[in-house]
Amino acid sequence: MKKLLFILAFLTTFSAFADSVSWLRYPSISPDGEQVAFSFKGDIYIVDSRGGLSRQITTNMAYDYAPVWSPDGKTLAFASDRSGNFDVYTVSVHGGVPKRVTTHSSKDTPWAFTPDGNNIFYF
């Protein structure tokens, strides 16, 4: 009986690890709390905060990460190395072609939008 319980516990634990998403990173909650943007395997996704299927926002060979919501919830800023080094880009939450915001030779990562949504703080 102890052996059976041990095997059952092992299989339950093993299956829990198999379902974990180890590549999901940099979660960012929308201003209204209804959505979560995140980085997964180098692209940006959005999912409903209550769960469900995610929508892919960026698709490319580059590494996109650190999404940040604009105050109105219509735009995401994120870092990407699609131009050779990490710069800040913006994209509509509905997808589309990202717009490059910074062109520095150093690594730029967005931190937040200004309250009016016209500028982005980055480091």
Labelled PLM ranges:
Residues 4-13:
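Sec-dependent N-terminal signal peptides
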Residues 18-22, 48-65, 80, 91-107:
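Multi-bladed beta-propeller domains
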Residues 85-89:
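Structural motif
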